[in-house]
């Protein structure tokens, strides 16, 4: 798996598993809202009143409605880096 997906998959999987509402902004500025139903290497299936298949190359930003905490055990990918929310002292 590509190095760039070492954070992407655990993030999307946590959104899917916890059914967190998300706003997805496309590169053309359109805002989509719903819940991540499924995803693969190329698309995200977004469910609201209908299901939409959104190609990842068209996505600019994914904004969860609430904070997520992704633990290292949720990612078996090498190179996965967890950033703590606590400020450095």
Swiss-Prot record:
Instruction: Give the UniProt record's GO annotations in the biological process aspect.
Output: regulation of DNA-templated transcription; regulation of RNA stability; regulation of translation, ncRNA-mediated
Q: Indicate yes or no for the key word RNA-binding.
A: yes
| Key words, A-Z | RNA-binding, Stress response
Please indicate which superkingdom the organism of origin belongs to. Bacteria
CDD domains listed in its UniProt record: Hfq
Might you report a single GO cellular component term?
A: cytosol
| A Pfam family this chain is assigned to | Hfq
Ranges of residues in domain Sm: 9-68
Q: Name one GO molecular function term.
A: RNA binding
Entry-linked Gene3D superfamilies: 2.30.30.100
PANTHER family registered for this protein in UniProt: RNA-BINDING PROTEIN HFQ (PTHR34772:SF1)
Q: Which NCBIfam families match?
A: Hfq, PRK00395.1
**Subunit architecture:** Homohexamer.
- Function noted in UniProt: RNA chaperone that binds small regulatory RNA (sRNAs) and mRNAs to facilitate mRNA translational regulation in response to envelope stress, environmental stress and changes in metabolite concentrations. Also binds with high specificity to tRNAs.
Name the family: Belongs to the Hfq family.
What's the protein called, per UniProt? Answer: RNA-binding protein Hfq
């Amino acid at each position: 798996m590509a190095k760039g997906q070492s954070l992407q998959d655990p993030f999307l999987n946590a959104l899917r598993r916890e059914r967190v509402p998300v706003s997805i902004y496309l590169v053309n500025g359109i805002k989509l809202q719903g819940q991540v139903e499924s995803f693969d290497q190329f698309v995200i299936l977004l469910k609201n009143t209908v299901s939409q298949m959104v190609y990842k190359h068209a996505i600019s930003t994914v904004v969860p409605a609430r904070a997520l905490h992704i633990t290292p055990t949720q990612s078996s990918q090498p190179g996965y880096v967890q950033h703590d929310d606590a400020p450095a002292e």
